Amino acid sequence: MIELNKIYNEDCLEGMKRIPDGSVDCIVCDLPYEVLNKNNANVQWDRIIPFEPLWGQYERVTKDNAAIILFAQGMFTAKMMLSNPKLWRYNLIWDKVAKTGFLNSKRMPLRQHEDICVFYKQLPTYNPQMVKCEPDKRNHSKGDGKHSQKNSCYGTFVEVPTIISDEKYPTSIISVSKEHTIGHFFHPTQKPVALIQYLIRTYSNEGDTILDNCMGSGSTAIAAIREKRNFIGFELSKEYYDKACNRIKMELAQPTLF
């Protein structure tokens, strides 16, 4: 049986078989894209996981209202969307802020984003992360109940300024800088903890269980801990499994304010 808040150093397709049916509230995973140098022995882990058995496990272990959130880019985005068109709903854009691809800058635009594919069976938990903004002031029509030639629909009225809100709903673009700081970069395809925290806050509630079947260096586990969620993780590489476990130990050892 699978324990919560633990990473397993094994093939995720085998490990997920031990997760009870309908027990996962949300999946956040950065699957291998198979875009790194295929001749580099250090990135042999970057191989696409067969979609059919992967989706078989995803659909079995998740609750009906669980969001399945998968990172992708380029042709892998198309493959990912077509791997389960029945459950695919929409894509988010991760704006990395920093640009890459300068060697090809005279041939194509600089790259600054990756895709995030969102799948689900039924409408999932959705907690929109409101964005602070300047209060939106609009003129509000206040009628007196009398009809006039000024406006045949609303009658005589005066306009009064009304403050609508100092928050706005989030868009499909999420801007979070990549983690480049020495001591915070552990994996070549590492995603920012802040980005995963944003996704976890949006698509789950405190106490929920988050699955990441390609845990890498443990960013999803760190994000889950900070957002008071449980996690289940799998990582095939012993090197990155060890790094993830060490990061989790360091995170749990940090003093909290509460």
How should each PLM-predicted stretch be described?
Residues M1-I2, C245-F258:
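Short, conserved SAM-binding/catalytic segment
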Residues M1-G233, S237-D242:
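Core catalytic lobe of class I
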